[in-house]
């Protein structure tokens, strides 16, 4: 019985990973559960055994991607505990690294698709929420007004996504120097009034 359970977990994991590749290749609207099952070498009914329906399957993929980032996020937060500014800067820089080094996951995190409803949008937003919460805490610690906080959230998110896109399309070479530039830009934004 334990072997079947492990095999079931392995199948579920394989389906999720194949689902990520499927979304990268075809987009959410064109996801084929049959194609994913074939990729994994399982029956076309197997995904429904693990996920119920297509929506649950996509939600499981998003949850998996969130989990991958949450592991790294927790390590960063622990390493810089007690220093909100450092947590923001390091987590933001870490997120850029995560997006660049895991392009198959980035596609899920940055996905914009008509088929996504508010639940999927909320699940994807959970990845970025801690950064916004940290910025809010930082602004409260330094009595920074709400309008300035909104600007800081906007600029930091723009720096994160802009850097990831520029690294991906070759406008900037991904490396220690350019990553340090992103790091320093985020830090500078926090220090600006």
Language model features by range: what are they?
Residues 60, 74-101, 156:
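Hydrophobic alpha-helical connector segments
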Residues 11-14, 18, 22-56, 60:
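Helix-turn-helix
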Residues 67-70, 74, 116-143, 150-154, ...:
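Amphipathic alpha-helical packing segments from all-alpha helical-bundle domains
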Residues 1-10:
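N-terminal intrinsically disordered/low-complexity leader segments
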Residues 73-80, 109-116, 167-171:
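Secondary-structure edge/capping motif, primarily at the C-terminal ends of alpha-helices
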Residues 146-169, 177-186:
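Hydrophobic alpha-helical segments that form the core
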């Amino acid at each position: 019985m334990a072997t079947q359970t492990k095999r079931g977990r392995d199948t579920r994991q394989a389906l999720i990973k194949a689902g990520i590749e499927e979304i990268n290749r075809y987009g959410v609207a064109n996801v084929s559960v049959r194609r994913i099952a074939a990729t994994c070498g399982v029956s076309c009914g197997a995904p429904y055994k693990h996920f119920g329906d297509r929506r649950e399957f996509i939600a499981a993929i998003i949850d998996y991607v969130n989990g991958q980032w949450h592991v790294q996020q927790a390590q960063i937060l622990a390493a810089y505990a007690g220093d909100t500014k450092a947590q923001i800067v390091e987590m933001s820089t870490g997120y850029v690294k995560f997006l660049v080094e895991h392009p198959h996951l980035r596609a899920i995190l940055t996905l914009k698709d008509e088929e996504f409803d508010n639940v999927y949008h909320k699940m994807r937003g959970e990845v970025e929420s801690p950064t916004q919460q940290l910025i809010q805490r930082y602004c409260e610690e330094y009595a920074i007004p709400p309008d300035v906080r909104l600007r800081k959230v906007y600029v930091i998110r723009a720096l994160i996504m802009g850097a990831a896109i520029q690294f991906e399309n070759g406008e900037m070479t991904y490396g220690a120097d350019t990553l340090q530039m992103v790091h320093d830009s985020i830090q500078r934004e926090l220090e600006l009034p």
